[in-house]
Each structure stands twice: as structure tokens, then as C-alpha cells.
């Protein structure tokens, strides 16, 4: 096995009582069995970017993940197509005496891309979820 992974986040600007944040990340993994065959169910090369505006209590964010096709799926495995996934969301944190209460909403896979993960045992049967909305409350104590 060999691979590389990176992740970086930095502040672009400060305005309106908050910070404009940007982040990039990516990974690449390759593996071969002793027989020379490709290791099955490895992820393809992935690159992502994130942009957010955040204050102490509020964050509005968007992120994009681009995954290449997996054309080295391993023996008895099907190749998977590449995809681009776009998510948008907002988080609000309310500090309490017993912990932080986080309210969140996320719009996942905004473009309703068909995504079949090369790492999934079910990729030939069922793709990942299409467009979805996730909202909730998280209490961290």
C-alpha cells in the first residue's frame, strides 16, 4: 500500500463580525496484492474544498468533494464512475451551563448526483443517497 493525504484550513478575511474560512483536502491510496492484482474496495483519488463564514456561535458553509473514477477495482469488482458532491449547511451553537446546544441544517448532495462508492459492498445494488435535508439538535456535554 502507498498513498498521500492532506488537509488545510485557513482564514481568508474577517468581516461582519466573523471570519471567511477556506479549506482544501484530498487523498490518494493505491494497493496491490502479492499476486499483483489490485486490492478491492479502495477509494479513488478525492479532492475537496470548503468555504465558510463563521462567528463564535454561527457558521454558514458549503463544501464540494470531487472523486475520480475507480478504474482499478480489484478482481471480481466493477469499476465505479467519478462524481462531484456538493453540500450546503448552517450551524448555530448556544452555550449553556451544562454544555453546548448545537442546531444544524445541511442540504446534502444538492445536485442529486448518483454516487456509487468503490468502498461499498452494496455499490452495484444501491447508490448513496441523492439530495437530502438533514436537520437536528446536538447537545455536547
Name what the model sees in each region.
Residues 1-73:
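Gram-negative outer-membrane beta-barrel transporters
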Residues 6-10, 49-53, 88-92, 105, ...:
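Residues on the lipid-exposed face of transmembrane beta-strands in outer-membrane beta-barrel proteins
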Residues 24, 71, 92-141:
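C-terminal beta-signal and adjacent terminal beta-strands/loops
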Residues 62-64, 78, 106:
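Low-complexity, intrinsically disordered short segments enriched for Gly/Pro and polybasic residues
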Residues 73-80, 87-91:
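Short, glycine/charged-rich beta-strand-loop motifs at protein surfaces that mediate ligand recognition
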